């Protein structure tokens, strides 16, 4: 079990760039929960820093994930700004159960295939958890950009899995950051559910 003192000491020892990336990440998730288009520039800066940090730290899957996040940050900003310029909001939509099952099925298959590759090449300390977090994060970021209501529920699960991954690999500071991400994902879920209900009324 992770000692609270270990977490505090790890946070105090965070390198400057990791601290900046963490703060940018917090700003991103808060703004995303409020449906602000300005979440995306913060996301771009956050993931740019993490791409470099994870690559230098020999975590290629996490570096690849953050590189993808950079592209999605550009896509999300263009998409959300387009609707603001047209004075129309992207409506929050809810997926049917069949779409959610398909989402989970595709994500699971891709995760298993990726984990098999990671296990065979021995480039990950925790291949199955690493693969699952990466694949579902990639898929779920698209749901966020398209304002699919269920994305926050998935983020809660993904971020919880990421916490376990970073604890296993002794990235305690990043694990602590993802505890905050999980809490903010609950806030995002509540806010978006309220907006979705308002849309229907």
Where are these regions (language model features)?
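Polytopic alpha-helical membrane-helix bundles and their juxtamembrane interface segments
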Residues: 2-35, 39, 83-87, 91-153, ...
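Generic alpha-helical scaffold signal
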Residues: 20, 39-45, 61
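Membrane-water interface of transmembrane alpha-helices
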Residues: 67-84
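Amphipathic alpha-helical packing elements
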Residues: 49-53, 59-63, 163-164
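Short, flexible micro-motifs
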Residues: 61, 79, 173
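Individual alpha-helical transmembrane segments in multi-pass integral membrane proteins
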Residues: 59-72, 178
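Hydrophobic alpha-helical transmembrane segments of multi-pass membrane proteins
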Residues: 42-56, 70-72
């Amino acid at each position: 079990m992770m000692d609270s003192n270990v977490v505090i000491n790890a946070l105090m020892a965070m390198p400057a760039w990791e601290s900046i990336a963490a703060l940018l990440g917090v700003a991103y998730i808060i703004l995303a929960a409020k449906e602000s288009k300005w979440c995306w520039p913060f996301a771009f800066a956050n993931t740019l820093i993490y791409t470099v940090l994870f690559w230098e730290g020999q975590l290629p899957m996490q570096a690849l994930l953050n590189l993808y996040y950079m592209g999605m940050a550009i896509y999300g900003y263009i998409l959300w700004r387009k609707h603001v310029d047209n004075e129309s909001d992207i409506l929050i939509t809810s997926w049917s159960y069949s779409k959610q099952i398909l989402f989970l099925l595709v994500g699971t298959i891709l995760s298993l295939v990726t984990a098999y590759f990671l296990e065979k090449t021995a480039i990950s300390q925790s291949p199955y958890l690493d693969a699952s977090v990466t694949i579902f994060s990639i898929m779920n970021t698209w749901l966020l950009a398209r304002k699919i209501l269920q994305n926050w529920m998935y983020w809660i699960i993904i971020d919880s899995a990421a916490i376990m991954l970073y604890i296993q690999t002794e990235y305690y500071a990043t694990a602590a950051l993802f505890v905050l991400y999980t809490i903010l994902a609950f806030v995002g879920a509540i806010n978006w559910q309220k907006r979705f209900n308002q849309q229907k009324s």
